[in-house]
């Protein structure tokens, strides 16, 4: 839910460490590990030392949680924790709808400084960290998982270990472009047509300014309705600088420009009265070409380019 800044995921967390107190005496070659699951694993975890690791960006209680524990005869311990929960995420929509988001789970040690407990990962952990083959996120293409160590500051100038596992996803822009960007760009034609539909002959405008102003006011209500619809569906777009906000601002600016031009030239004939009808006709001709060119260049500059990766097979 990008509007709420959360996502729901099932995360498999694997932790491995060595505890010499759990090593068995005598020959250990071929001796299988002690395996515990669910309630038995939780009971055994209360009897041994387990690193105080939490998913720090988890929101609320987990919808599902299950443990698996293996204690090897040489003292190595492997803990598997599968959890389904909501996680907080910072959504960046600056490049909407060609944006990428990082869906991350923060694995952090709480209450113990990094000098005593640290989190490390190697190639086997990187190979283990991948999206499920059954993973499906409607409207998004699923990329790869990245692991990054990022300790967090704690009390008394100490740090606590943290590893961030992030899944890169890219928005599929097809539906968004059709439902938002095509109407936004099409609405820019309304103020341009309100300028282009008029013309001067013998120093007089051929279309009454009142009719063109009606077109502009109708376009204003259309943009307001589109604005309300978009922000109701994508609340996250209402804040910050993004392409949608820029195009809405350009629409309002173009409508205001068209309204000013029609009142200034068509209603009051300011230049014709101040100078001559010829001066007004030439000035209006320049505006007929300058405004569409400026609007087109600005709209093109506001629209981000697409950089979409292929989904994971």
Question: PLM features: what roles do these ranges have?
Answer:
Residues 299-313:
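Juxtamembrane boundary at the C-terminal end of a transmembrane helix
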């Amino acid at each position: 839910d990008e509007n709420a800044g959360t996502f729901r995921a099932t995360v498999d967390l694997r932790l491995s460490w060595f505890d010499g107190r759990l090593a068995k005496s005598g020959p250990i070659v071929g001796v299988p590990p002690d395996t515990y699951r669910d309630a038995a694993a939780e009971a055994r975890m209360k009897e041994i030392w387990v690193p105080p690791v939490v998913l720090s960006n988890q929101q609320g209680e987990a919808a599902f949680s299950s443990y698996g524990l293996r204690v090897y005869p040489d003292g190595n311990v492997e803990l598997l924790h599968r959890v389904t929960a909501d996680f907080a995420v910072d959504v960046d929509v600056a490049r909407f709808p060609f944006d990428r988001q990082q869906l991350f789970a923060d694995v952090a040690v709480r209450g113990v400084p990094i000098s005593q407990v640290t989190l490390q990962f190697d190639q086997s952990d990187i190979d283990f960290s991948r999206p499920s083959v059954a993973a499906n996120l409607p409207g998004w293409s699923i990329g790869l998982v990245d692991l990054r160590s990022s300790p967090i500051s704690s009390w008394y100038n100490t740090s606590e270990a943290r590893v961030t596992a992030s899944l890169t996803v890219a928005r599929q822009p097809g539906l968004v472009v059709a439902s938002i960007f095509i109407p936004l760009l099409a609405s820019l034609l309304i103020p341009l047509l309100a300028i282009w539909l008029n013309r001067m002959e013998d120093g007089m405008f051929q279309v009454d300014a009142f009719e063109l102003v009606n077109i502009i006011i109708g376009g204003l209500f259309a943009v307001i309705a589109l604005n309300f619809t978009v922000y109701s569906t994508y609340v996250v777009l209402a804040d910050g600088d993004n392409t949608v906000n820029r195009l809405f601002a350009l629409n309002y600016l173009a409508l205001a420009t068209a309204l000013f031009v029609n009142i200034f030239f068509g209603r009051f004939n300011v230049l014709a009265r101040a100078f001559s009808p010829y001066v007004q006709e030439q000035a209006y001709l320049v505006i007929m070409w300058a405004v569409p060119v400026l609007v087109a260049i600005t709209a093109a500059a506001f629209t981000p380019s697409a950089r979409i990766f292929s989904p994971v097979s």
